[in-house]
Amino acid sequence: AEFLGWFTEATGGTQVTENDVFTETADKTYYAHWEITEVFSVTVPVVLPLTVDENGEVHTGAAEIINGSTGEVIVSSVSISTKNGWQLVPFNTDMAHVKVDAKQLGFKINDSVTTKTGDTETLVLRGPWDIAENGKLPISYDAVVSAVSKAVTEQEVLSIVFVLEWGGE
């Protein structure tokens, strides 16, 4: 916020300057005027760790989106793309019938899931994706993965793009 000066009214009024001479004998109220600078500052996770062990068990971590803006923001879109030969499948896919090392992956983030087969998908967002000023949005995520012949620990399998915009009025 930037201080604009002292004024004779809460809104509008005349600015009081160092050249003004005060001759009032009664109490007088002056009002500080500020210009609020809107700031859009949001921190999104750089990595959502996902480990698949030899038994096909998926292990995830904790993540959150942090809103450091001067107002509410909303996640308006979440798009995912596969990397390194992986393919998206619906999250409810039964992976027991998929070949070992088929590199298929169904993904869930908060209450939104993959529903298509392919390399990219923009998720249908379900549940609240708004983040109050100075608030946080916890990100829970999970995956179903086709069986692997060796653990997958240090390979990028997805790229996720969060689109955020001002929320509220």
Give the positions of each predicted feature.
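C-terminal, structured domain-capping segment
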Residues: 36-37, 63-70, 121-169
